[in-house]
Regions:
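Pre-active-site segment of Zn-dependent metallo-hydrolases
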Residues: 11-22, 77, 83-96
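Active-site neighborhood of phospho(di)ester-bond hydrolases with catalytic His/Asp-centered motifs
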Residues: 5-7, 28-34, 51-55, 77-79, ...
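Binuclear metal-dependent phosphoesterase catalytic core
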Residues: 17, 70-71, 94-100, 123-156
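N-terminal active-site segment of His-dependent metallophosphoesterases
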Residues: 1-48, 58-64, 135-138, 144-146, ...
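Short acidic, glycine/proline-enriched helix-loop-strand junctions
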Residues: 48-49, 114-129
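Conserved beta-strand segments of alpha/beta enzyme cores
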Residues: 2, 49-51, 74, 121, ...
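Active-site environment of divalent metal-dependent phosphoester hydrolases
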Residues: 10-14, 36-40, 57-62, 83-87, ...
């Protein structure tokens, strides 16, 4: 199973189209906030489930965090700003452990990275629209097989 992961499109519908074109075989998508309209577009384009959380720039009644289980892997989703993710991933890691999740996904920083801490794989897809800290436009994918998950960053 392949989960496509993106965040922080901030109104850039062309970015969503580029992401989908780069990963048309995704079985589902995680959209980590700051682009609810683009999350809706992705769902229409792909015809696949799109799990979303609310970003600090989103309005409306959207969950601020969510736990999903795919292929036997528990995945914690949040935008990240409520966990001071711009400083470090420690609070995010603790929340994922508390929820018994093997993977934590976040956005907000616009900086693509994958790290491992406290038995949790922590993934930020960066931004396909406005990346920061010299990173390229990007998204991430999570490949799930036999109850384990492996993330990678995909540059656009």
């Amino acid at each position: 199973m392949i989960l496509g992961i993106l965040s922080d499109t901030h109104g850039d519908t062309d970015a969503v189209k580029r992401v989908y074109a780069a990963l048309p075989n995704a079985d589902a998508w995680a959209f980590l906030g700051d682009g609810q309209r683009e999350a809706n577009l992705l769902e229409v384009m792909s015809g696949k489930p799109v799990y979303t959380v609310k970003g600090n720039c989103d309005a409306g009644d959207i969950a601020e965090e969510q736990v999903i289980t795919l292929g036997g892997v528990r995945i914690f989703m949040t935008h990240g700003h409520a966990y001071a993710i711009a400083l470090n991933s420690y609070r995010l890691m603790l929340r994922a452990q508390e929820l018994d999740c093997a993977v934590a996904l976040y956005g907000h920083t616009h900086v693509s990275e994958i790290e491992y801490a406290g038995g949790v794989q922590i993934v930020c897809p960066g931004s396909p629209s406005v990346p920061r800290r010299g990173r390229r436009k990007s998204f991430a994918k999570l490949e799930i097989e036999n109850g384990s998950a492996m993330a990678s960053i995909v540059a656009l």
